[in-house]
């Protein structure tokens, strides 16, 4: 598939040329659509899910160490990056709160956080298995592996077990 542009006394037009059954097909698309597509794809490329890897991280109001500390989070706290400024990430969390964190405090580790009150963590991936412990909303875990809709998780303190994916973000 090729891309050819045509310059004239009208808005920029793109012609997409493809070959189908030994015949050339030319499709004309206007720059507005292509511009829209580029903006959408650029925004998607920036969006990235990361995890706090430091024992504790300060969440700040802006991209600087002298910005106010809004709150603190613990290890394995998952974030969704919405903007980058230098060495800082602006993010949204599971409660749709936003803040800034320095890139040295995050990594690409797979992690989840409980989104419901009183979530059971079990010995094996089934509701029929023994409950090892129960956690409140907002507790982060590293994901070790998955089996169907179940996640084998580990807390920063070393506690492990299985949790259903409907209970986490």
PLM features: residue spans?
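Compositionally biased, low-complexity intrinsically disordered regions
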Residues: 14, 20-22, 41, 130
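Bacterial N-terminal signal peptides that target proteins for export
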Residues: 22-33
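SH3-family beta-barrel domains
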Residues: 45-61, 71-75, 82-123, 131-139, ...
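Bacterial N-terminal signal peptides
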Residues: 34-42
């Amino acid at each position: 598939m090729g891309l050819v542009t045509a310059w004239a006394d009208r808005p920029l037009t793109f012609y997409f040329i493809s070959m189908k059954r030994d015949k050339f097909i030319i499709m004309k698309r206007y720059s507005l659509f292509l511009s829209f597509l580029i903006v959408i794809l650029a925004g998607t490329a920036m969006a990235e899910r990361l995890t706090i890897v430091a024992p504790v991280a300060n969440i700040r109001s802006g991209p600087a160490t002298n910005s106010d500390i809004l709150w603190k989070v613990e290890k394995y706290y998952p974030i969704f990056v919405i903007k980058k400024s230098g060495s800082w990430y602006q993010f949204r969390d599971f409660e749709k709160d936003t803040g800034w964190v320095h890139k040295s405090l995050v990594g690409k580790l797979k992690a989840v956080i409980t989104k419901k009150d009183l979530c059971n963590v079990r010995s094996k991936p089934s509701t029929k298995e023994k409950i090892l412990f129960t956690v409140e909303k907002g507790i982060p875990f590293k994901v070790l592996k998955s089996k169907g809709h179940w996640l084998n998780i580990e807390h920063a303190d070393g506690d492990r077990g299985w949790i259903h994916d409907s209970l986490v973000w």
